[in-house]
Amino acid sequence: MSLIDPRAIIDPTAILADSVEVGPWSIIGPGVEIGEGTVVGPHVVLRGPTKIGKHNRIYQFSSVGEDTPDLKYKGEETRLVIGDHNVIREGVTIHRGTVQDRAETTLGDHNLIMAYAHIGHDSVIGNHVILVNNTALAGHVHVDDWAILSGFTLVHQFCHIGAHSFSGMGTAIGKDVPAFVTVFGNPAEARSMNFEGMRRRGFSEEAIHALRRAYKTVYRQGLTIAQALSDLAEPAAQFPEVAVFLQSIQTSTRGIIR
């Protein structure tokens, strides 16, 4: 049976797997579904429609699945979908989507969302992402796998944060961050690539060296984006990692941080 503290309030339409734990004074509203092994701490508010997968842990004072504050929202049915093995620390806020976009906010698997971080409506978070304390994502933000946003990072709506990228503390991001790139400052500027993160994740030295050359092509040779992308076509055919970097620039809709 579910391990539900008697002081918690659970809507009768909520669906909880047998092994779900719910702490005291938490509120789980209608339309919430929680998978096996998930632990909901005390003083958590979950609103639906929200689907939460397996083996997640949600800490006290978090608000997950709340209505978006977007002024265009008029009570339409929208969703939040959370995958498996995520850690959502104290005071995190995650809003559902809007019908003007996908009507869904999505959080993948194995993410760490640290205290007081915010994930805005219609955002899409991949896997193995870390949002450090007080990081705030506006609506419609996409964060790809293995990105790390340090504390107090602010991300403008509709920005795309590339895979394996990194932001320094207090960075204000107003354009897209290409895959692997490290950004710092307010406004954000590209400083280097996340080479330490690549090594920790087992990237080969050949791939890292190829990415280093690709970074210099885009950021250090005074080329236009079109010229740089043309020069990267050959190394992208040799190294999948360079292809990921190249694609993250090609698909940018807001322009990249340079």
Curated annotation (Swiss-Prot):
It comes from the Bacteria. The keyword Cytoplasm applies. Disulfide bonds: none annotated. GO terms for biological process: lipid A biosynthetic process. The keyword Acyltransferase applies. Keywords: Acyltransferase, Cytoplasm, Lipid A biosynthesis, Lipid biosynthesis, Lipid metabolism, Repeat, Transferase. It catalyses: a (3R)-hydroxyacyl-[ACP] + UDP-N-acetyl-alpha-D-glucosamine = a UDP-3-O-[(3R)-3-hydroxyacyl]-N-acetyl-alpha-D-glucosamine + holo-[ACP]. It is an enzyme of class 2 (transferase). InterPro entries: Acetyltransf_C (IPR029098), Acetyltransf_C_sf (IPR037157), Hexapep (IPR001451), Hexapep_transf_CS (IPR018357), Lipid_A_LpxA (IPR010137), Trimer_LpxA-like_sf (IPR011004). Pathway: Glycolipid biosynthesis; lipid IV(A) biosynthesis; lipid IV(A) from (3R)-3-hydroxytetradecanoyl-[acyl-carrier-protein] and UDP-N-acetyl-alpha-D-glucosamine: step 1/6. CDD domains: LbH_UDP-GlcNAc_AT (cd03351). It is found in: Cytoplasm. GO terms for cellular component: cytoplasm; membrane. It holds the Pfam family Hexapep. PROSITE patterns: HEXAPEP_TRANSFERASES (PS00101). NCBIfam families: lipid_A_lpxA, PRK05289.1. Homotrimer. HAMAP family: LpxA (MF_00387). Involved in the biosynthesis of lipid A, a phosphorylated glycolipid that anchors the lipopolysaccharide to the outer membrane of the cell. This is Acyl-[acyl-carrier-protein]--UDP-N-acetylglucosamine O-acyltransferase. The gene is lpxA.
